[in-house]
Amino acid sequence: MCSPEQAPDLFHAVLAGLGQCAVLVRATLRLVPAPSQVRHYILYYPSVEALTADQRLVQADGRFSFAEGEAQLNPNGPGWQYYLEAGAYYDSTPPDDDTLIGDLHFQRGTEQISDLGYYDFLDRLASAVAFLESTGEWYDPHPWWNMFLPGSVTDSFVSGVMANLTEADIGASGVILLYPLRRGDLRAPLLRVPDEPVIFLFSVLRTAAPDSGGALSPDAMLSSNRALFERARDLGGYDYPIGSIPMTTHDWRQHFGPQWPFLAAARQRYDPAGILTPGQGIFKPGPNKRGTELPG
């Protein structure tokens, strides 16, 4: 058993430690009462800059219980359209729409507003999952790319990426996510993020479906992931390591930076034989399950 007070080195090595030091089999979490209803908003924007400006605003004042940004192919023309998906939790009295969205700069007349039960809100992707299971795309390779970006470079970097991104690059069921996080809320030492008050998670969630009409191959998507990773890293971005970016041991040392000695010491103490999660090649070259066979 470990906690911030009991075996704290193991506790902090497990959080964002990518399975290098222990296997988490049980956790104790504090619970809070769940709301009964959610006022659900989808608000459309013409550009990355317009979306992120409102995202920064609603993050700063905390008006929503949930807020996330996405991009989708523009159904009315070339390129992409962007939207803010947000939720305001309540029990008996619905929130006032004008108070929540009256000062935002979305495209008026395109907003979608609905009320959902809390469970229905949490389970709102179930029908999409069922559809992808029925088509087989749920079981195709998903070479995901996820990175934390400094807020100061997010608009220019994301706009540049999106200007050249096509449906073939992400697959017919691919998803683009973009939303801000407060740096101060992320306290796990091994979770590497930019050193700015506001950072953004930018995710290109690809599906390499061979039958989706022109999607790139998994290898091509992995190569693109690597190229995007290097561009973002050079701007101060950090990999959010849940996806498929080919990485070398040197990359991992660079990724963990000043936390590398702590992770290496914890690995030596708790898994000296190197049994746990070797496929990522973090401590020695090997078959990198997040991409391909890589040298050190």
Descriptions of predicted regions:
Residues 1-296:
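Noncatalytic alpha-helical scaffold of FAD-dependent oxidoreductases
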